[in-house]
Amino acid sequence: MLYYVQMKWTGSGYVYSICRKDTPASDAVCVYTTNTGFIGDFFILQDRIYFATSVDKDRMISTVDLNGENAYAITACSRDCIGCYYSNGWIYSYSAKDDRLARFRTDGSQYEWVGEAEIKSGWYYISNGNVVYSVSNDGTTTIKCFNTEKKTTDTLKTFDTTSAWINGLYGNHLLYEVYDAKKEGDVVTGGTMRFYLYNLNSGTDYTLGNDKIEGTVWNDQIFLCDKAGNAELRSLQDPMIVTKEFKLPNALLGNISTSARLVLAVGKNLAFATDGEGSQVKIILMYSEWKELTSFTVN
């Protein structure tokens, strides 16, 4: 069973829906639709869906049951919450009003700020009580870690470039990438994208490879691929060894910003964003044998 957000143009605006596919071959079922705003990040916990949404210009976190009924907001519009991520009994969301990352329980209670004000929307990952995030200032990028139990912030890595991004966090393993630019004087003439794996416990860094553009870490594995869809797997137990190489059925989505994630973990599977027809995006879900499980298009 697969849930996803669909955005459909009606001629006067977009209508957002949470849809479900019960089997790879089945038609999509519209579970919940809003005509007043957007639907963004979401997760499913027990018998309810929790999601970021809006009513006109007011943004909030709401919830609805799996039948699309009993919908209600769990944060006030005044919080102006962006993003909806779950970890260890807490929902994490960025409050644009407070300009702070916050967390709260699934009923909206125990609302509290998380870490420093420098943690911005969309630039953090959460695992094992750690919030790992990046900060770019004055030509540098710093990767930091806030521990939600100790309430402490540690600096993990610092780079003399703003072309550094975090890509995923699984357990105590952080995947990040850095663009190593080649210059002649002050002019950039080329460069190489490099992925790295960092162990939060030991501080060990592993260089994983060059010229890959997308990657994620999940299910004790590391996935990397290039623009043409040439992919590889590595194990977290020995990240320097490529355990499998294969070709994706489609090249990754083109003409997209660096901050957009084209590869996402979906349970034990991976989902890839590829080019569809016209302005559509084709989503391909692949299972553990690295064969296509299902695909669908979204606007």
Predicted regions and their residues:
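Repeated scaffold domains used in trafficking and secretory/extracellular systems
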Residues: M1, T36-Q46, R79-N88, E118-G129, ...
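A short loop-to-beta-strand structural motif that recurs across blades of beta-propeller domains
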Residues: S17-C19, M60-S62, R100-A102, T142-K144, ...
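Short loop/turn segments that connect beta-strands within beta-propeller blades
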Residues: D22-S26, V64-E69, R105-S109, F146-K151, ...
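Hydrophilic extracytoplasmic domains
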Residues: A181, Y198, T204-G209, I213-N219, ...
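Residue position within the beta-strands of beta-propeller blades
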Residues: Y3-Q6, Y50-T53, I91-S95, V132-S134, ...
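Solenoidal tandem-repeat scaffolds enriched in leucines and small polar residues
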Residues: I82-F146
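Short glycine/acidic-enriched loop and turn motifs that connect beta-strands
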Residues: M7-S12, S54-D58, K97-D99, S136-T140, ...
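A short beta-strand motif characteristic of beta-propeller blades
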Residues: D27-T33, E69-A76, Q110-E116, T152-T158, ...
